[in-house]
Amino acid sequence: MEITQRIELLKNLTQLNATSGYEDEVAEFLIKTLSENEIPYQQDPLGNIIVQMGENPDRIALFAHMDEVGFGVRGIREDGMLKFAPIGGVTDNILFSTPVVVGNNRVSGIIGNIPKHLQEKKSEQETKIPDMMIDIGATSKKDAEKSVKIGDPIYWLSDFVRFGDGLIKAKALDDRVGVAVILSLLLTKQYSFTAVFTTREEIGIMGARMVMPVLAPKKAVVLEVTTCADLPGNQEPTTKMREGVALSVLDGASVSDTEWNQFIWAIATEKNIPIQKKLTTRGGNDAGAVSYVSGGVPTAVLSLPGRYIHSPVSVISETDFDSMYRLAELLIKKA
């Protein structure tokens, strides 16, 4: 599949809403696409989607998670404002004034709090989520309850934009990037491998924990998005944009298989596919579940460097996106 087609697929995926536990929109898109292309799939009770392509799919499995970080409605005030809680890891200080969509009714809202110029000095410290509210334009609790209920998921509202020198801005690039790469490979119908689209990664890799006991891949690759530190200032080294996909050594949930990592690094270098090492060990991903079941599966993590991840304006490079596809394609050929 050509890069322009993959970028269009990524655009379509990022415009879908799927916080952890509410992955239906992405799952339905995948199921519709797979069905239209006569690609068999399975879906387990937790919503994970498994595709086993070709005659020997257990050679290698590729993983990507469908969910994104977001929020849930935890209360409705008497004045019609919504109280909310995070779903996944979200930083409080990026939220004020961001537009959101609430629930299946797609109610528009804005995250707000007391304006800075009206706050007393004692309130000048960073505002936390419990002190914020979502304004949906309701005049009362009764008015708000006509379209919103406690427990409704809340999503960021953000356009997909190509800008600058080959950059992409969107919400949910973590991990619609991985989903787009794997789906693109499936649609070629050229390769034998297992594809796994997992749920609930952002709240403790729950989907991967459930799906792995029924799989038996000889090797695995988790496709992800990670932080990058390529802007001016004193930042912890992580990855750099436009320098290729990042290969993890270890993180907070797993240690990558050394021999598998060495193979990946060598073959990427041989084929002139840009690759770098991820220098930070923070965070975790589905590899934390994939590595340690079925007697142990040699697992590697390939991550795309992303600026401002877990926000409505995450940014990636088109060339890095292409590098991930090319390397994943090479691995399912050569593993």
Where are these regions (language model features)?
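N-terminal hydrophobic/helix-forming segments and targeting peptides
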Residues: 1-335
